[in-house]
Amino acid sequence: MRTQWVQQRADDKIRTQLHYAKKGIITKEMEYVANIENISAELIRQEIERGRLIIPANINHTNLKPMGIGIATRTKINSNIGSSSLASSIDEEVEKVKVSIKYGADTIMDLSTGGDLDEIRTAVIQASSVPIGTVPIYQILYDVKNDILQLDIDTMLSVLKKQAKQGVSYFTIHCGFLLSHMPFVAKRKMGIVSRGGSLMASWMMHYHKENPFYEYFDEILKICQEYDVSLSLGDSLRPGCLADASDEAQFAELKVLGELAKRAWKADVQVMIEGPGHVPLNQIERNVELQKQYCNHAPFYVLGPLVTDIAAGYDHIASAIGACVAAWKGVAMLCYVTPKEHLGLPNAKDVREGILAYKIAAHAADIARGRIGARDRDDAMSDARYSFDWNRQFELALDPDRAREYHDEALPQEVFKDAEFCSMCGPKFCSYKISQDIFKAHNAKESEDTQPLASNQ
């Protein structure tokens, strides 16, 4: 759908949404986002110009439907997919893309580390109508034969350029983790839990050199300018357990990310900030407020956070609790967690469970934040429930398939789609029906009492 839009800007040296926003230009992508968010296109432009909103939309991903990530728009969710060296295939990853989009993912990250990474990424981008993000360090490691010590600047930049050409709309770059942060890491219970962060730590400590993603940040920005790739500044030092939450390492890196965000904005590159992780419920608001302070209100994109470390097998629930609070307090996008977190590679079924948990969290947060129209669907569901409109209830549910499946387990016959009860209470104990009968009887009695008395003749 974007082919013509992109072609009209083909002669421009810098083709980022931020570049146009600064020039006072409302792009077709901005108009599209404004329409689906039900806010003005000028507000979208202003929020992009201020760095508070991004539209990740690589110029080469033309079948992408633009979407906005920022405090002015509804809370978004990301679905992580990707192969490992032990599991999955191209077909399985494409199936995860389809499931992600069906159940409401706003963006998808391809975190593949096994198989033919270029083929997988190409297939994922072609199959997706939502922006695709990547963590380029995985491809870099693949290209240096899994020996991170062989990383060099040319390989690093060539991988970024290749992925930008393929149509990746945002990169997670581990650029805020510095050598000076290592003493803070040494105090932790769990050290570095970011895959990309741990790889960079290995390289930095072996060569006793600064993080190359930090050192060559300006070169990365040039690639982003050319293809309108947004940067998701990665939190290499996110806490991996409650004991490490809100520590020196986490916030030292966050301050660096804030400085790098300013450099990205100066170069007309869109940017968001990644956040934790594992955080006790009572610390989430402080984490959000400090991110706003250190990063000048750049969109905050968090993983969870998980509010307990003992929910193995149910981490999608443990993290959705934290995600809801985080979004309520100002986080712009939530990275989902599946039931397989900490246990294994998620399959399509796990992807569905993770997305639905996070759709609930994001929607609840939007209601709490008072977004215009956020509760309309809930009110429509209440009307459908009270009127026993079962098909409408299924339609309004975040997961219509699951709602219908559970209803039909006990009452599968089509006649029960018109029944004024379900299998929970049956026809005699339904509170809705009892309430309706009470008011019906009361209204009938009132009607009788107000009838004029017949004249005696």
Swiss-Prot record:
Pathway: Cofactor biosynthesis; thiamine diphosphate biosynthesis. The keyword Iron applies. Keywords: 4Fe-4S, Iron, Iron-sulfur, Lyase, Metal-binding, S-adenosyl-L-methionine, Thiamine biosynthesis, Zinc. It is an enzyme of class 4 (lyase). The keyword Iron applies. Its EC number is 4.1.99.17. Zn(2+) binds at H278, H342. Its cofactor is [4Fe-4S] cluster. GO terms for cellular component: cytosol. It comes from the Bacteria. Pfam families: ThiC_Rad_SAM. InterPro entries: ThiC (IPR037509), ThiC/Bza_core_dom (IPR038521), ThiC/BzaA/B (IPR002817). [4Fe-4S] cluster binds at C422, C425, C430. One of its GO terms (molecular function) is 4 iron, 4 sulfur cluster binding. Binds 1 [4Fe-4S] cluster per subunit. The cluster is coordinated with 3 cysteines and an exchangeable S-adenosyl-L-methionine. GO terms for biological process: thiamine biosynthetic process; thiamine diphosphate biosynthetic process. It catalyses: 5-amino-1-(5-phospho-beta-D-ribosyl)imidazole + S-adenosyl-L-methionine = 4-amino-2-methyl-5-(phosphooxymethyl)pyrimidine + CO + 5'-deoxyadenosine + formate + L-methionine + 3 H(+). Substrate binds at N80, M109, Y138, H174, S194, R195, G196, D235, S236, L237, R238, E274, Y301. PANTHER family: PHOSPHOMETHYLPYRIMIDINE SYNTHASE, CHLOROPLASTIC, THIAMINE BIOSYNTHESIS PROTEIN THIC. HAMAP family: ThiC. Belongs to the ThiC family. Catalyzes the synthesis of the hydroxymethylpyrimidine phosphate (HMP-P) moiety of thiamine from aminoimidazole ribotide (AIR) in a radical S-adenosyl-L-methionine (SAM)-dependent reaction. Homodimer. This is Phosphomethylpyrimidine synthase. It comes from Helicobacter hepaticus (strain ATCC 51449 / 3B1). The lineage of its organism: Bacteria, Pseudomonadati, Campylobacterota, Epsilonproteobacteria, Campylobacterales. The gene is thiC.
